[in-house]
Amino acid sequence: SSSGERAEQSTVTAPMPGTVIKVLTEPGAHVTARQPLVVLEAMKMETPLVSPYDATVRAVHVAEGDRVAGGAVLVELDE
């Protein structure tokens, strides 16, 4: 069953392949819109990936040093 765009909104994904260099949150944490959750290094640039809205972190699927593919789910959020 497809949950459509709702599923995408409740996850933070890697925009490109890269290496996770910082994890700035943990499950159960309350985060605000635009708060950085994970920092990804790709093509020698550090890219902070931010929460799309105020939320509670449901799960963190990566650790510092992990290599991830583009589109990989890094963090799951609950509104």
Question: What is each of the regions a protein language model found here?
Answer:
Residues 3-79:
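Structured functional modules or segments
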